UniProtKB/Swiss-Prot annotation:
The lineage of its organism: Bacteria, Pseudomonadati, Thermodesulfobacteriota, Desulfovibrionia, Desulfovibrionales. The active site is at S102. Catalyzes the conversion of glucosamine-6-phosphate to glucosamine-1-phosphate. This is Phosphoglucosamine mutase. Belongs to the phosphohexose mutase family. It comes from Nitratidesulfovibrio vulgaris (strain DSM 19637 / Miyazaki F) (Desulfovibrio vulgaris). The gene is glmM. GO terms for molecular function: magnesium ion binding; phosphoglucosamine mutase activity; phosphomannomutase activity.
Amino acid sequence: MGKRLFGTDGLRGQVNIYPMTADVALRLGLAAGTHFRNGNRRHRVVIGKDTRLSGYVFESALTAGLCAAGMDVYLVGPLPTPAIAFLTRNMRADLGVVISASHNPFMDNGIKFFDKDGFKLPDEMENKITDMVLDPDWQWDYPAPERVGRAAKIEDSPGRYIVYLKNSFPAHLTLDGMRVVLDCANGANYKVAPLALEELGAEVIKIGTEPNGLNINHQCGSLYPGVAAGKVLETRADVGLALDGDADRLIVVDEKGTVLDGDQIMALCADDMLRRGALRNNTLVATVMSNMALEVYMKERGCKLLRTPVGDRYVVEAMRREGANLGGEQSGHLIFMDHGTTGDGLMAALQILRIMRERDRPLSELAGQLQLFPQELINVHVERKIPFEQCQPVLDGVAKVEAELGDRGRVLLRYSGTEAVCRVMVEGEDPEQVKRLASLLAETVQKHLR
């Protein structure tokens, strides 16, 4: 039909405004169930969510649609997105569903799917599901009454996920004596993350672990790393860890209160894996948003940085294609393919804590190897996402900025896959020049793409 429901990270929008409505979710459950039902055996679906109040609405609607399509539904409650990917594999399910809008505020929600192997669905599969949802005349292939699905709650899911996480941490190591500030954004990891770290021996100072359905990501979590940074300095902690609402991304704070983004974390992990001979094909996969300094850093070590479009699903696709086992995004999505299939904030945190413990050095020293180029990112609200090549003034503006930067900088324009926003990014060596050029280009975009 040509229309799309899904962005770079599933379906997302404001609750009770199309397409984030109960009736769309019901049809989405029917469509997904129809698509994944194969043969006469019982089919299984795992559904998890974050802590948003509206999660109950979409959990019920999806469950109704999936059961009507003949799928047995297992409800695991509030759990991180990567936990659903793991449980889908672990429980031999045919499909995993996450109800979350990630780092967005509580009034938004979203729906994304994982296949039986724990990977996000490719575009072509999402498009097939979309066609069924959007076609009002679609003839549903309902199963016989005795073949409709059942729904059941699974109570031990958090424990399964914790065991899985701890299995990625060396058995001979503990976190005894380590003080960790942990900000869970009042989101999906509010129970699991503190418990996992405490079981490994850490002293955990908690932030954002009291969700009420409305406070997810509210002035806490990975979008507000200053909160964790302040607590690190106040408590003299060894490290600060800030997760987002569905806990698939991580921002880290060192013992001096310095915030480290995904690029700096990837550099640290790549260096560690190189030292251990574990970086497969000497390749790190990142997106077009990653800092130029990361590319230089990898080249200096005889390694390759492979860039993809923005979205951890595209990073994962490239990792699978290239045989890489480390990838991520500047925003804090980090994928360790030896352990998981998608971005996992707590898994990434455990890898960093392991490096700190094994090297017995403060994080500021370990992560200080990567000196980032100045980078300015401006989000410009747009009403319509017109292809850039159809707007000559914007193309002229980009060319002008690129000419001034020369080969010591770069420009990137891209539309958000989840918001009505055009992201304007300028990078170079001179911070004042970078800031000035980004502002000029953002003004051009705002004027001609509104």
